[in-house]
Design a protein with these regions (language model features):
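Transmembrane helix-bundle core of multi-pass membrane transporters
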Residues: 2-16, 87, 91-154
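Structural signature of hydrophobic alpha-helical transmembrane segments
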Residues: 13-25, 63-75, 139-143, 189-203
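Loop-to-transmembrane alpha-helix initiation sites
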Residues: 17, 66-73, 92, 96, ...
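Short loop segments and helix-boundary regions at transmembrane helix junctions
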Residues: 33-115, 211-223, 242-243
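Small-residue-rich segments of transmembrane alpha-helices in multi-pass membrane proteins
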Residues: 50-60, 97-109, 129-130, 173-177, ...
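Membrane-helix/interface signature in polytopic inner-membrane proteins
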Residues: 147-180
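Transmembrane alpha-helical segments in multi-pass inner-membrane proteins
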Residues: 198-249
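Cytosolic-side transmembrane-helix boundaries in multi-pass membrane proteins
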Residues: 245-289
């Protein structure tokens, strides 16, 4: 029994997949707390699709895909930030323009210059086929991003809560937003290998949304988000060995199940709890009359 449970760790590719998935899951979950706070969930989706031309360009130039994806994602994030602040357009309009433009360019490049990597690999991900060099890149990206987040989480929290107050205490909202979007681009680059461009939005939204139903204070929300992201990614990668299914799909399904369970049963803000409170309030009103 124990030998069966430990069998995945006897294979190098599974150990690498589990390790990378856990770190990337924690990083994406950390950022998801801020996306929930600001209501920027769709920006994560836009950036996930905006890295496609960068990946295509990197392969054409013989560069690591992470470099191209990071440059493309950073450019898309900068354009979204610039247009949101200077054009007067609503954020969702800007996201739609940037998302479709970058993804369209990526598909166009791939169609013109067939590559050894298929567009399906970019979109769906394949963590089990990760090479040692790719794993090292992702671990470096994830570790550096987590260190920066640990150092700057409080400043980012102030900016995301109230930019005016952030300026009065000497912080630069624009500079910190650039830092945040850079970290978001880095996390999406890392997550691409894990779940692909289509499912990465779940990793940067679902953990924060789940923790939102449980926590009242933002620091606790961050910690719980990271815990949810790391545990579900670890479990999903581990279970994929026995289920023989797509690792990314299993991870996202697990995160969705956890979200639905918390949404229904959270003691303070869950759906069932809210309905019971409404029913109790109605009874008090009836008894009062």
């Amino acid at each position: 029994m124990i030998d069966t449970l430990l069998e995945p760790f006897s294979y190098g590719y599974m150990t690498s997949a589990i390790l990378v998935s856990t770190i990337v899951g924690g990083l994406c979950a950390f950022l998801s707390a801020y996306l929930m706070l600001k209501g920027w969930s769709l920006i994560g989706d836009a950036l996930a699709h905006s890295v496609v031309p960068g990946v295509a360009g990197a392969y054409l130039l013989g560069l690591p895909f992470a470099i191209g994806a990071f440059i493309s994602g950073g450019l898309a994030a900068s354009l979204m930030l610039f247009l949101s602040e200077r054009s007067g357009l609503k954020t969702d309009v800007v996201i739609g323009i940037i998302f479709t433009a970058f993804f369209g360019v990526g598909l166009f490049v791939v169609s013109l210059y067939p590559m050894s990597i298929s567009i399906e690999t970019i979109i769906m991900g394949n963590i089990l086929a990760i090479s040692y060099s790719d794993m090292l890149q992702l671990l470096i990206i994830g570790s550096i991003s987590l260190v920066i987040l640990f150092l700057k989480w409080r400043d980012l929290m102030v900016v995301f809560f109230d930019e005016s107050h952030a300026r009065t205490v000497g912080l630069s909202p624009s500079r910190l937003k650039i830092v945040f979007f850079t970290l978001l681009s880095a996390s999406i680059v890392a997550a691409l290998q894990t779940v692909g461009a289509f499912l990465v939005i779940a990793m940067v939204v679902t953990p924060g949304a789940t923790a939102y139903f449980i926590c009242d204070r933002f620091p606790k929300l961050i910690l719980l988000s990271v815990l949810i992201g790391s545990v579900t990614c670890f479990t999903g990668a581990y279970l994929s060995f026995f289920i023989d299914g797509a690792t990314g799909g299993i991870i996202v399904v697990l995160q969705t199940i956890v979200f639905l369970g918390v949404f229904l049963a959270a003691p303070k803000y869950g759906y069932i709890s809210a309905r019971l409170k409404i029913r109790q309030a109605n009874k008090r009103i009836e008894n009062g009359f």
